[in-house]
Amino acid sequence: MLIKYHLLLYFLFFIKCYPQTAILDLALKHPDPAIQEVLRNKEKHEIQILLTKIKRTPSEEILFEEEDYQIDERRYFYPASTVKLPIAVLALQKLNILKSKGVIITGDTPFFISTKEGDTIIQRDTTHNKGKLTLHHLIKKIFLVSDNDAYNYLFDFLGRDYINMELTKRGLNHTQVYHKFLFGADNVNTWEYTFLDKDQNVLYHQSSLHAELELKPNKLKGVLKGKGYNSLDVLVNKPMIFEQKNRISIRNLQGILQRIIFPDIFSNQEQFDLTDEDYKFLRKWMSRTTLESNNPNY
């Protein structure tokens, strides 16, 4: 973490002092021992860096200038919690698709989640001022505190097939979303979702979805990680295999951000199917901290 802060400070310094210079190159050549120690062991640390400068022409056209270090889309990159970003986006997109089919629900419509057998998974969210479980509130929690349960609930609202087909359709071809953040979770069959009006009448019910799309294992460089891991409280003394773990390349991750901030530079096919209000909502909560939120109030 300290190294990340060092690099960030150097980027800011060089942006101010050397505006026409290759900023990333200058930062990586800085004699700071922490940076140089990592660079001497760059294969061990699996460093990939993508720095993008945003420029506007006199006619307000958006241009991106990139600098990169060891970017390799053939090398596995585990996205960790950043995988929650496209899930939040696609939840809003699916809501728009449902509306276009005559389903009268919004991001603030309360719902509950149950199993196929009818057992309730969750019906209230105690972090909501009124105890409501809503799509908008789950998205807020993802951006504010990287809430794993919020991601899991949105994952199943979408279904794994929808997630991966939509991301591929948008040109994000180095991305696969395999799983929830829940030990022992069923990532193939979803829970059921029931949306209610203020009088508790059912507005929309989504039955369990079954994933049919066969996801190809990540046959990339670097899918073996570490030298041991815990499985059911037993130490396994060999690297963990990440062939069937979530994957987003750094360029695809940047591409998702660019589609949110600058959607108009992409073709209609590459853009997410979002409204202006959706974009405003995403940008607002992506930029907020817990101190700037009173619902949820952490």
Where are these regions (language model features)?
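Soluble periplasmic/extracytoplasmic beta-strand elements of cell-envelope proteins
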Residues: Q48-T52, P86, P110-F112
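A short, well-structured edge-of-sheet supersecondary motif
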Residues: K29-I71
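Bacterial Sec-dependent N-terminal signal peptides
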Residues: M1-A22
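Short, glycine/proline-biased beta-turn/loop segments that scaffold the active-site neighborhood
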Residues: I97-G131
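Extracytoplasmic
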Residues: K44-I47, E66, D72-R74, Y78-V83, ...
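Active-site-adjacent helix/loop patches that line small-molecule binding or acyl-intermediate pockets
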Residues: A22-D32, K44, T115, T126-R259
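Conserved SxxK-family serine transpeptidase/carboxypeptidase catalytic domain
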Residues: E243, D264, N268-Y298
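Active-site SXXK
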Residues: Y78-T106
